Regions:
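Charged helix-capping and loop-helix junction motifs
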Residues: 107-109, 138-146
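Divalent-metal-activated hydrolytic enzyme cores
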Residues: 145-178
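Histidine-centered catalytic micro-motifs
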Residues: 122-133, 163
Length: 178
């Protein structure tokens, strides 16, 4: 543990390192490196399960505070769909897309099917920007409109689209982009 901290400098840097980078540190084998790369993923799942219980998302601030921890240590763009009931209670939080450092593929069909299967009244879409700002790109805006329109056809409201970058987030609803 000390060798890893000495090499990478911080615990954050250790958890963000790849298996290959960790195995370059003397005394760190494949098993240890693999275990350490799983810790952030396990932590995210634990936080999701813990926070899902009785979570109400009535505002962009509620949603942003829920979402920021889910993106900790992510090195690629990830898209989540938060399915809500009629009282803005969280039914589920599903990963619906994963990509590379600066882009994630999003299937409008998968989003609609997920929302329908969860019996959502409304949904919040979210994705992260890895090494940039939490500002929407033109492509983010166009994709959001396509998803909003598809959801409306089946009677589901897109309540918000939140972009997370580090500890910051931007709400499409608050920005007038929905």
């Amino acid at each position: 543990a000390h060798a890893l901290l000495d090499h990478f400098g911080t615990l954050d840097a250790v958890f963000e390192a790849s298996c290959e980078d960790m195995m370059r540190v003397p005394g760190v084998g494949e098993n240890v490196a693999t275990l350490l790369t799983l810790i952030p993923q396990v932590g995210r799942r634990y936080q999701m399960a813990k926070r899902r219980q009785q979570t109400i998302l009535r505002s962009s601030e509620d949603a942003g505070n829920y979402l920021v921890p889910l993106y900790l240590y992510e090195r690629t763009e990830v898209v989540y769909l938060l399915c809500l009931d009629a009282k803005c209670g969280l039914i589920s939080c599903k990963e619906v897309g994963r990509g590379v450092v600066n882009a994630a593929e999003v299937s409008v069909r998968a989003i609609v099917e997920t929302a329908l299967s969860q019996k959502a009244v409304s949904v919040i879409l979210s994705h992260n920007h890895v090494d940039a700002y939490a500002l929407p790109s033109r492509e983010d805006e166009l994709t959001t409109r396509r998803i909003r329109d598809a959801l409306l056809l089946v009677g589901i409201t897109l309540a918000d689209h939140i972009i997370v970058c580090g500890e910051d987030y931007v709400s499409f609803a608050d920005s007038g982009l929905l």
